[in-house]
Amino acid sequence: MLTFTKRCDDHGKTPDHSLSLPFETRQKSRFRAQFEDGTPVGVVLDRGLILRHGDVLESDEGVRVRIEAAPEPVSQVRGTDPLLLARACYHLGNRHVVLQIDADGLRYLHDHVLDDMVRGLGLTVGFTHAPFEPEAGAYAGGHAHGHGGHGHHHAHGHEH
């Protein structure tokens, strides 16, 4: 099985394949998938790396694959009032909901309970299948948010 072990910063060479993956899979550092023709592949990357649409991975044999964000069930929030959208971000963030924030609204993985909450704030919520590319988060370039493996403690202002 072809195994992809590194992310390429050099996008000069055209990828040999593409791999369409939902966000849940793109968060994992180790997984199996398959190309559209059914060829099985493996991905083994450093922990904590989230694959983004357009990333290119390379195998030890030099084969390259372009990652694509697969369409998946998402809730699409639309509104013209920036304050209402900010309130929705606040309430969804308090629930640790992963969000895609665009110029004209928000997207999150579909959840009817969250949809009802957001509608209660006065926003319009629709359902669609679309690529989901959420915000990387405040700690994207730093250390992992978990506490396993290090000996000191620090407060975050919220419970885990």
From Swiss-Prot:
* Basic and acidic residues composition bias: residue spans: 1-16
InterPro entries, sorted = UreE, UreE_C_dom, UreE_N, UreE_N_sf
* CDD domains assigned to the protein according to its UniProt record, in alphabetical order: UreE (cd00571)
Protein name per the record: Urease accessory protein UreE
What residue spans carry the region label Disordered?
1-20, 138-160
Q: Which organism is it from?
A: Thioalkalivibrio sulfidiphilus (strain HL-EbGR7)
Compositional bias segments (type: Basic residues): 144-160
Tell me the SMART domains matching this sequence.
UreE_N
Gene symbol here is ureE
Q: Which Gene3D superfamilies match?
A: Urease metallochaperone UreE, N-terminal domain, UreE, C-terminal domain
Role played: Involved in urease metallocenter assembly. Binds nickel. Probably functions as a nickel donor during metallocenter assembly.
Listed GO cellular component terms? cytoplasm
UniProtKB keywords: Chaperone, Cytoplasm, Nickel
Q: Just give the chief location class.
A: cytoplasm
Q: Does the keyword Protein biosynthesis apply?
A: no
